Amino acid sequence: MLSELHGLNDCWNQAWLEKDAATVERLMADDYIYVAPNGLTLDRQAILAIIRSPSYRLDHATRTEVVVRALGQEAAVVRHRVQAGGAFEGTSFTDDHRCVMVCVKQIGEWRIVMEQGSFSSK
């Protein structure tokens, strides 16, 4: 189970680096929600619009400090730090966030239900 969730985390990161919208879509639960460090909430459709946007580019993304905690057999929390940079809608960004992902097993596959990012204090 833990190795599956580490794999999910790696796959999610790689999909964003490769702008692989099909994989991002497959890994998100239908009711996926992202809470950004500024409090903005983005649903599944908003996230898919970003990754599919020609103006979105992720140049690098490194996930460290990954901790997976099982919550029974069908739920887990994944905590990590992500340091990334790229551009969206003509604006460059550099991120350093601590993130929490809530994952559930649905029809035999792990899906990401929600993520929350917070600005890292380093």
Regions found by a protein language model. Name each.
Residues 1-27, 31-122:
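A beta-strand edge to alpha-helix "cap/lid" segment located at domain peripheries
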